[in-house]
C-alpha cells in the first residue's frame, strides 16, 4: 500500500507514546523514521536516547541542545510579559512546544521528509501547539498525529504497554507508576494516575526538582538578581547565559521548597485537567521582575500591560506563538521593558519567595515625594481639588437618587 509517506520526522522523547510510535509508523506507513529529540533542559531523560531510538527502529536521531535558544527566545520573552495562565501556571510546557516543532520542521526540510509526527494525545493542548506551529511555518507539510490517525489501534496506555512488551521496547516508566512528566529549564509537569483525582494529594515521590517546604533549610537564602531590559542577566553579581541562569536559579529555589503548583486548568480543547508543576527558578524570577517594574514602569503603562497578561498567556498556552497577534503583542511588551533594568534582592524560605529589596538607575520612586515626614516638593492641600474633581460624578449620581 502506497501511503505517500516515505520519510517522517518524529518529535521523540523516549517516553511511552513516542517509543511505541516509532514502530507503529514503520508498520503502518512503511516509511523511514527519523527521530528528533530537543534538549530543552530535561537532563537525565536524554540518557541512552540515541541507542534506544535506533533499537526501536529509527534510521537516525537528532539530539540537539536547544537550551540557550529556549531560555533566550521563549522563556525570557514570556518573563518580560509577566505571563501567567489562569493566575497560576508559568507556561513551562506551552513555551517549549513551539521551539521543538520549529526545529522539527527545519529538520524535515533538510532531510526531504514528507511528513512530521508527534505523540500528543487528541485530548490535550500539545497536539494544538505542535500542529499550529507546523502549519504556521510549513503550511503544506503532511502532519501525522498518531492518536488521531485512523490506523491507530491503541485505546489506552495499557494497550501501549502490551505493545511495547511484545516488541521489546524499553520504557522509562511502569504500569504501577505511569505518571506522565515533562521537564525543561522552566519546569517539570506531572499528570496522570492518582493525580487525575483532584482530591488526592500528590505523593511526595513524584517531585523531582524541589524539596517540600517542610524539608527546606531552616535559614533563609538571599539572592540578588540583575535585570537588563526585562531579562535576568546575573545572580549575585555573576553574569550567566540565559540557560545557565535558569539552571542555577532552579537549584537555589528548588532547595528552598519554592515553585510547587497544584492546579485544575482549562485546556484549550474544552475540558479541565489537573496538573502538578514544579517551577522553582521561574517563580522567583517572575516575582523579582514584577518588583523591578514597580520601580521603573509608569502607572498607566503598567495598567495597560497588566490587562494584556491574560491574553499573552492564553495565546502561548493555546499554541499561537507564531501568530501575527502574538508578534504584535510581544513588540508592545518589549517597548515597556526598555527601562526594566536594575537589581532585586529576594529572600527564599520554606516555599516562600519574598522581595526584600529593589533598585534601578531608572527608578521613578522618589523618597522626597513618598516620605511621611515633612517635605518641600508636595503640597498636601493640592489633593483637595484633585479629590473633588474625581468625586464629581459620584456626587452627581448621589444627587439624582
Curated annotation (Swiss-Prot):
A GO molecular-function descriptor: argininosuccinate synthase activity
Entry binding sites for L-aspartate: 121, 125-126
Record bears the keyword Hydrolase: no
The protein's enzyme class: ligase
Pathway participation: Amino-acid biosynthesis; L-arginine biosynthesis; L-arginine from L-ornithine and carbamoyl phosphate: step 2/3
Regions annotated as coiled coil: none
Binding positions (L-citrulline): 89, 94, 125, 129, 180, 189, 265, 277
Catalytic activity: L-citrulline + L-aspartate + ATP = 2-(N(omega)-L-arginino)succinate + AMP + diphosphate + H(+)
Gene Ontology BP annotations: argininosuccinate metabolic process; L-arginine biosynthetic process; urea cycle
A matching Pfam family: Arginosuc_syn_C
Keywords, comma-separated and alphabetical: Amino-acid biosynthesis, Arginine biosynthesis, ATP-binding, Cytoplasm, Ligase, Nucleotide-binding
Entry binding sites for ATP: 11-19, 38, 119
InterPro entries according to UniProt: Arginosuc_syn_C, Arginosuc_syn_N, Arginosuc_synth, Arginosuc_synth_CS, Arginosuc_synth_type_1_subfam, AS_cat/multimer_dom_body, Rossmann-like_a/b/a_fold
Keyword ATP-binding: yes
Assigned EC number: 6.3.4.5
One GO CC term on file: cytoplasm
Localisation per UniProt entry: Cytoplasm
Protein family per UniProt: Belongs to the argininosuccinate synthase family. Type 1 subfamily.
Subunit structure: Homotetramer.
Protein's recorded name: Argininosuccinate synthase
Source species: Syntrophus aciditrophicus (strain SB)
Amino acid at each position: 500500500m502506497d501511503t505517500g509517506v516515505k520519510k517522517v520526522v518524529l518529535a521523540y522523547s523516549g517516553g511511552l507514546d513516542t517509543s511505541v510510535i516509532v514502530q507503529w509508523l514503520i508498520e503502518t506507513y512503511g516509511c523511514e523514521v527519523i527521530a528528533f529529540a530537543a534538549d530543552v533542559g530535561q537532563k537525565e531523560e536524554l540518557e541512552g536516547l540515541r541507542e534506544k531510538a535506533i533499537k526501536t527502529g529509527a534510521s537516525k536521531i537528532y539530539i540537539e541542545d536547544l537550551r540557550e535558544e529556549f531560555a533566550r527566545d521563549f522563556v525570557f520573552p514570556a518573563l518580560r510579559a509577566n505571563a501567567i495562565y489562569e493566575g497560576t501556571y508559568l507556561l513551562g510546557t506551552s513555551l517549549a512546544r513551539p521551539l521543538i516543532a520549529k526545529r522539527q520542521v527545519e529538520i524535515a526540510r533538510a532531510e526531504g521528509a514528507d511528513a512530521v509526527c508527534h505523540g500528543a494525545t487528541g485530548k490535550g493542548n500539545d497536539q494544538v501547539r505542535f500542529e499550529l506551529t507546523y502549519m504556521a511555518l510549513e503550511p503544506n507539510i503532511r502532519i501525522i498525529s498518531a492518536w488521531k490517525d485512523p490506523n491507530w489501534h491503541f485505546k489506552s496506555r495499557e494497550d501501549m504497554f502490551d505493545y511495547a512488551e511484545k516488541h521489546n521496547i524499553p520504557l522509562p516508566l511502569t504500569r504501577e507508576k505511569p505518571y506522565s512528566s515533562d521537564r525543561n529549564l522552566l519546569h517539570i509537569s506531572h499528570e496522570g494516575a492518582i493525580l487525575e483525582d483532584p482530591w488526592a494529594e500528590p505523593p511526595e515521590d513524584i517531585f523531582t526538582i524541589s524539596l517540600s517546604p517542610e524539608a527546606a533549610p531552616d535559614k533563609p537564602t538571599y539572592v540578588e538578581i540583575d535585570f537588563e531590559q526585562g531579562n535576568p542577566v546575573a545572580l549575585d553579581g555573576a553574569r550567566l547565559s540565559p540557560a545557565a541562569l535558569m539552571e542555577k536559579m532552579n537549584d537555589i529555589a528548588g532547595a528552598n521548597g519554592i515553585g510547587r503548583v497544584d492546579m485544575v486548568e482549562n485546556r484549550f480543547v474544552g475540558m479541565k485537567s489537573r496538573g502538578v508543576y514544579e517551577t522553582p527558578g521561574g517563580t522567583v524570577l517572575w516575582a523579582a521582575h514584577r518588583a523591578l517594574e514597580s520601580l521603573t514602569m509608569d502607572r498607566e503603562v503598567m495598567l495597560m500591560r497588566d490587562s494584556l497578561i491574560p491574553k499573552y498567556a492564553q495565546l502561548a498556552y493555546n499554541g499561537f506563538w507564531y501568530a501575527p497577534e502574538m508578534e504584535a503583542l510581544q513588540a508592545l511588551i518589549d517597548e515597556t521593558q526598555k527601562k526594566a533594568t536594575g537589581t532585586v534582592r529576594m529572600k527564599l524560605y520554606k516555599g516562600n519567595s519574598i522581595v526584600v529589596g529593589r533598585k534601578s538607575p531608572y527608578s521613578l520612586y522618589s523618597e522626597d515625594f513618598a516620605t511621611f515626614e515633612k517635605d518641600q516638593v508636595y503640597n498636601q492641600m493640592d489633593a483637595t481639588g484633585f479629590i473633588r474633581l474625581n468625586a464629581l460624578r459620584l456626587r452627581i449620581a448621589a444627587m439624582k437618587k
